[in-house]
C-alpha cells in the first residue's frame, strides 16, 4: 500500500486525537456565511517522503497531478503573481481587479539578487548551486519577505525550500533531498496537493541536474483540520488504500524552464472517489 496514505492517515488521526481546538478564540479565517472558521491543530508536524521508493500521491482520493503541477510551475518557472497566467481558479479569492496577488509567491522567486557570480533570481541560484556547488549547505529559497508583506494579498503558506545533496556509497550519481517549510496548512484541501507539487519539483530539478531524488521532508508549523472538515476527514481516512502510482517525467527535458504539464503523468493511479463541494475557509 501507499506509504503516503499511511503518513496522511496517521497525521489526521494524531490531529483529531491529540490536537488542540481554536474554538472560541479570535481567528482570522471565516466561512462564506461569515462565521469564524475554527480548527483542530497540531504544532510542528514533520512528514518524511522517500521519493526514491514511491511517488507520494495518496490513493484515498485523487490528487490532480497536472493541476497542482501547473500551479507549482506558475510559481517556480513563470514566477508569476497574476492569476491570468493560471488555468486554475484556486487563487481567484486573493486577486485584485487586475488579477494580481501582490508581491507574493512567484513574484518573490523572480526578484533578481546580486551574487559574486552575477545577478540571479532564487530559482536560478538554486539550479546554479546544484550544478556547480552541490554540497553547499546554503541552497535554499525563501519567499516570506517581511519588507513586502504589506503588499501581498495573502502571506505565503509554504515559504521555504532547503535543498541538500548527498552521495550514497557506491552510487555514481548524487541524490537530491529537500526540506519544505510551511507555516500553516489546511490538511484536507492542501496537504497532498503541496506534497505532490514539491515532489514533482524535486524530480524535475534532479533530472536537469543529473541527480537522483531522495527525501522530501515536510515541516508544518500549524497543521490543522477545520471544524467543517472533521466528518469529511474521518470518512476519508477510513477508505481502502491502494498501491502508490508511478511518476513518469519526460526524460528528454534537460532545462527546467522547458517543462510543461504535458511532460508528466501518474501511471497505475487507482484512487477512491473525490470529495466534492469541500467548504473553503478564507
Give the location of each predicted region.
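Terminal, non-catalytic protein-protein interaction segments that mediate quaternary/complex assembly
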Residues: 1-282
Amino acid at each position: 500500500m501507499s506509504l503516503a496514505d499511511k503518513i496522511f492517515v496517521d497525521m489526521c488521526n494524531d490531529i483529531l486525537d491529540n490536537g488542540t481546538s481554536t474554538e472560541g478564540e479570535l481567528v482570522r479565517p471565516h466561512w462564506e456565511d461569515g462565521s469564524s472558521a475554527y480548527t483542530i491543530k497540531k504544532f510542528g508536524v514533520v512528514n518524511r517522503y522517500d521519493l526514491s521508493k514511491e511517488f507520494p500521491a495518496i490513493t484515498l482520493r485523487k490528487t490532480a497531478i497536472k493541476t497542482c503541477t501547473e500551479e507549482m510551475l506558475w510559481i517556480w518557472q513563470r514566477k508569476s503573481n497574476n492569476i491570468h497566467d493560471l488555468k486554475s481558479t484556486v487563487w481567484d479569492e486573493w486577486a485584485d481587479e487586475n488579477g494580481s496577488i501582490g508581491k507574493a509567491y512567484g513574484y518573490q522567486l523572480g526578484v533578481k539578487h546580486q551574487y559574486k557570480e552575477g545577478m540571479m533570481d532564487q530559482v536560478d541560484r538554486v539550479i546554479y548551486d546544484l550544478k556547480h556547488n552541490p554540497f553547499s549547505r546554503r541552497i535554499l529559497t525563501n519567499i516570506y519577505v517581511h519588507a513586502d508583506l504589506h503588499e501581498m494579498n495573502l502571506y505565503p503558506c509554504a515559504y521555504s525550500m532547503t535543498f541538500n545533496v548527498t552521495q550514497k556509497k557506491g552510487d555514481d550519481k548524487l541524490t537530491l533531498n529537500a526540506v519544505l517549510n510551511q507555516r500553516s496548512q489546511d490538511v484536507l484541501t492542501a496537504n497532498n496537493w503541496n506534497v505532490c507539487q514539491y515532489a514533482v519539483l524535486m524530480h524535475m530539478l534532479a533530472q536537469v541536474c543529473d541527480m537522483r531524488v531522495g527525501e522530501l521532508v515536510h515541516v508544518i508549523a500549524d497543521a490543522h483540520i477545520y471544524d467543517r472538515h472533521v466528518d469529511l476527514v474521518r470518512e476519508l481516512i477510513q477508505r481502502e488504500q491502494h498501491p502508490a502510482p508511478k511518476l513518469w517525467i519526460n526524460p528528454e527535458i534537460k532545462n527546467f524552464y522547458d517543462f510543461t504539464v504535458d511532460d508528466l503523468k501518474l501511471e497505475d493511479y487507482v484512487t477512491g472517489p473525490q470529495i466534492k463541494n469541500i467548504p473553503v475557509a478564507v
